[in-house]
Amino acid sequence: MIYTYKECMKKWSSNYQIKKQIDTGNLFQIEKGIYSDTPDVSTLAVISVKYPKAIFTMDSAFYYHGLTDVIPDEYHIATDKHSIYLSDKRIRQYYILSDILNIGVTTMTRRDAVIRIYDKERMLIELLRYKNKLPFDYYKEILGNYRGLIYELDIERIQEYAATFPKPKMISEALDAEVF
């Protein structure tokens, strides 16, 4: 299990006791402010604990949902538009408007981590919104995989999401032309 410094202080009540747990091998410091009771912890688990309000999006979400086999070089996370810059080199941060940030958020378990991630319906909207910023082959691969999943998706939810986002007409036209 992964602990933050705050959780360690609650459990062991002092820095001395935390260091004592580390020295005896009961606790391992993974990085500054992040501890674990096992020595091997995935980077995904560390990021999900270190940034609990962050939501996995774009390349990371496409990969975790099985829509592409391209493993992203960075963890793509969405944060509120007014959030501070995260200087973590492992992360690519997307600033999202507050009123649409939490639309379509769900949780997923990947190996030893429980992550907050956008659902497949939300990610279809994101794919269409950012299609000009993605490599064409990558876009077509993901779109083709969505066409294969069309009967598993909640079409009503997709239409609700499309109406909520900026430029709803453009999103609806792209859905009709390229997906349905």
Predicted regions and their residues:
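Nucleic-acid-binding surface
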Residues: 3-7, 17, 22, 35-180
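A short, conserved structural fragment
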Residues: 25-31
